[in-house]
Amino acid sequence: MGDDLKRKILLHNLSSNNPILEKLKGGQEPNSNEEGSDSIGDLPSLKNDYKRQDNNSTNCTYIPPSQWNTYFRSNEHIKVQSRNIEFNTYYTVPSSILGPSLPVFIFHHGAGSSGLSFANLARNLGDQLNNNCCCLSFDARGHGGTKFIDAKQAQNYFRDDFVDDFHTLVEYFVSEKLKHLPTEKLSIIFIGHSLGGSICTFTYSKLSIELKKQVIGVAMFDIVEEAATLALEKVNHFLQVTPNMFSGYEEAIDWHVSHELSRLRESADIAIPALFKSTESGKVVRITNLETFRPFWRTWFSDLSKSFVSLPTCKLLILAGNDNLDRELIIGQMQGKYQLVVFQDSGHFIQEDTPRKTALTLVDFWKRNDNKNVVIKSNWGSSNKV
């Protein structure tokens, strides 16, 4: 049987027999009946190394339809001198834990995106879990509100640079922001979209032994090594047809929705403005120029599929539409090495297009793979009374 036929059969069976999707009967994501075409893929002790400042203001007069505090409790800038970066972070941390386990969802966006791409998903996760969960999202280097502390230093965007950033931030966040919570109850899941999936995958091996014990899984959204590598060859065309400037934020939102780069208006209202900054003329310009990353592209996805499949933790891959698996992923799926879910009604930005369905899938993934939730009842010594 040829590889193409294997892929089609495998993806068809998974998309048509997905128990999580049954939960959505009677309630669909808005605009979920429109399939459309996908866009190119998005593309030691740390305590004294950080300085923090609250960020409750915006650097422009535009007030978006949705603001970050609708989705997260905190928006904080965290300086990491050793990385020469001030991270713009968004997070929600509960004051206590209800139950045997607290799921901690840590997100990493893809190239050209921002931490607020996960805003609507984070809110849906909170709704599904009655706010008994933790969510962390942030802007990666070269994106959104994250800045280099010393702009004169070399600014590289190799995969290892993103990985080291993510590793450093995660270790700090868990040790400082979650220190009031029982460590044994934390169940961390890394979730990466496109390039973010690659970063999450390669970060796992760098974690401390203690943190690895708390990570119960890694999830990747719409990323397949073979397809992503081929997509890089089309980036020039993508850059040519994608405007970098709009008359205002509303026009930018409208354009992205109309071109199905973000299919759900509710998600676009919070995710798209974070991709732009205002100019003196009143127009808005895109913060991230993907052309800047060109010298580093080839490092982003190399050896991803094999590395993902071989991760010594639970794994989830969610694909949009009819994306094909490559050879390593096909073999891994047939061997039961990871869970595969296909959303036929989503574009490339799964977390934006289908936030409710994605949240349900992540909650199910957590429940099935977290042994803290397993309660074994014994009938030993019990007797039946008549």
UniProtKB/Swiss-Prot annotation:
Organism in which the protein naturally occurs: Candida glabrata (strain ATCC 2001 / BCRC 20586 / JCM 3761 / NBRC 0622 / NRRL Y-65 / CBS 138)
Any one Gene Ontology molecular-function term assigned to this protein's record: protein C-terminal methylesterase activity
Annotated region described as Disordered, given as residue ranges: 20-48
Any one GO CC term of the record: mitochondrial small ribosomal subunit
SUPFAM superfamilies, A to Z: alpha/beta-Hydrolases
UniProt name for this protein: Protein phosphatase methylesterase 1
Pfam family of the protein (one): Abhydrolase_1
Enzyme Commission designation: 3.1.1.89
Function: Demethylates proteins that have been reversibly carboxymethylated. Demethylates the phosphatase PP2A catalytic subunit.
Presence of keyword Zinc: no
Catalytic activity: [phosphatase 2A protein]-C-terminal L-leucine methyl ester + H2O = [phosphatase 2A protein]-C-terminal L-leucine + methanol + H(+)
InterPro entries in UniProt: AB_hydrolase_1, AB_hydrolase_fold, PPase_methylesterase_euk
Protein keywords: Hydrolase, Serine esterase
Protein family membership: Belongs to the AB hydrolase superfamily.
